[in-house]
Amino acid sequence: MFLAVLYCLLWSFQISDGHFPRACASSKNLLAKECCPPWMGDGSPCGQLSGRGSCQDILLSSAPSGPQFPFKGVDDRESWPSVFYNRTCQCSGNFMGFNCGNCKFGFGGPNCTEKRVLIRRNIFDLSVSEKNKFFSYLTLAKHTISSVYVIPTGTYGQMNNGSTPMFNDINIYDLFVWMHYYVSRDTLLGGSEIWRDIDFAHEAPGFLPWHRLFLLLWEQEIRELTGDENFTVPYWDWRDAENCDICTDEYLGGRHPENPNLLSPASFFSSWQIICSRSEEYNSHQVLCDGTPEGPLLRNPGNHDKAKTPRLPSSADVEFCLSLTQYESGSMDRTANFSFRNTLEGFASPLTGIADPSQSSMHNALHIFMNGTMSQVQGSANDPIFLLHHAFVDSIFEQWLRRHRPLLEVYPEANAPIGHNRDSYMVPFIPLYRNGDFFITSKDLGYDYSYLQESDPGFYRNYIEPYLEQASRIWPWLLGAALVGAVIAAALSGLSSRLCLQKKKKKKQPQEERQPLLMDKDDYHSLLYQSHL
């Protein structure tokens, strides 16, 4: 019955976020460099007739990039998305999307006016049914072809500058795998030449905002695919872990009994095929990953190079990261010292904050530890552990934002590695998002973490302090009222005692003594409320 429902769902939903909109993948759109599809609600481009948005020229930042990429005009991702499009939808108010058909993160309802905050939870706190539902959603996404998005299989030059489009269909899960590959791939310089020192989502300031957006879009896709408006990705809290405690068949897949590099046949994910894992092959042929299946998921946790990654991160490591006051420093790349971003990403020591090329720690340590598909940057998103891992990394980013409350100006405006400046549009997303747009608290983006709710100092500051301040202003009146109340209570008590004595004298047989119910339901709630304050 479950499989029947799953496969009925398989073909019945359409989704609306990813990379290249199918509606903008024609030679007409590429030659015109315009991506302003109609909103199906009124049929007008960008929903303009309904006031949702309009087709506008893209305004690119003129801030200079760092010296890490010494070329210009050789990579389609430069000045994203200007190689492909120079006009896209600019949405109004709380509307969002490549055709302004969606709501901004944190808003819902037909007119995007309903504010919402959803909670990401620890995967070990999910019930069996919740956990299995999450896995079924992953499976559904893996088997559902996107009706809205396609992926390019060639560079703009290989497409004859747009006159011969080269695009493939792709399933929803692999769409995000492909995006992670595309943003981190090497630059193809022609012939056999490549440039490796480039990455639009790693080793620089945009690492945390980019992956934050990636997860938000992924959640949005799953909600639209399944109709589950409350879906959030769970996180894996790996602090102080001695092994991969989610690498069991009950969760993300145990070890194969005969081949330790494969997943157990009993795992949800043992039959999954991966894509975009052969970077050297693509480089040698000067081609892009085209989404062709390349074999099963590989994972052999713990059998990695322990000289480079001696252990998984500890609570103390996380706390040290959070204590760093600078988001970014120096050259703003993998050599940055005392940088929160570089330390959390794993290129600087979580003991000293000094960049150490001989070690991989924090975020990087988990990738290395998995010793398989997840250990190669471009193809790492094939493994569903990637989602849970990055959800927890994002929660650490969120803790840092709440603790230090940085202004937007803290995020570098210029001279960061290419694609990582504050106002740079993030590759390869359409609609367009800037790095700085996600340098804000998660609550402003419509989500929170279950373990941060209890310890959020903002709760005390925003909700408890005002009541205490109000109480301090009226305490003299409260004291006076209490004294008057005590006098009245004493008088009533005396009168009650006299009446009771008179009644006892009249009765010949003694009455059974009863203990009052001090913890009646309403009394208990009142006591809890006062004790919590």
From Swiss-Prot:
Lumenal, melanosome side: 19-476
Catalytic activity from the UniProt record: 2 L-dopa + O2 = 2 L-dopaquinone + 2 H2O; L-tyrosine + O2 = L-dopaquinone + H2O; 2 5,6-dihydroxyindole-2-carboxylate + O2 = 2 indole-5,6-quinone-2-carboxylate + 2 H2O
Subcellular compartments: Melanosome membrane; Melanosome
An annotated GO BP: response to blue light
Gene3D superfamilies named in the record: Di-copper center containing domain from catechol oxidase
EC number(s) given by UniProt: 1.14.18.1
One protein family per Pfam: Tyrosinase
Binding locations of Cu cation B: 363, 367, 390
Residues exposed to the Cytoplasmic side: 498-533
Required cofactor names: Cu(2+)
Residues annotated as transmembrane: 477-497
GO CC, one annotated term: melanosome membrane
Tissue specificity annotation: Expressed in the skin.
PANTHER family: TYROSINASE, TYROSINASE FAMILY MEMBER
Disease linked to the protein: Defects in Tyr result in various forms of albinism. Himalayan strain tyrosinase is temperature-sensitive.
Purpose of the protein: This is a copper-containing oxidase that functions in the formation of pigments such as melanins and other polyphenolic compounds. Catalyzes the initial and rate limiting step in the cascade of reactions leading to melanin production from tyrosine. In addition to hydroxylating tyrosine to DOPA (3,4-dihydroxyphenylalanine), also catalyzes the oxidation of DOPA to DOPA-quinone, and possibly the oxidation of DHI (5,6-dihydroxyindole) to indole-5,6 quinone.
Family: Belongs to the tyrosinase family.
Oligomeric form and interacting partners: Forms an OPN3-dependent complex with DCT in response to blue light in melanocytes.
The name this protein goes by in its record: Tyrosinase
Organism for this UniProt entry: Mus musculus
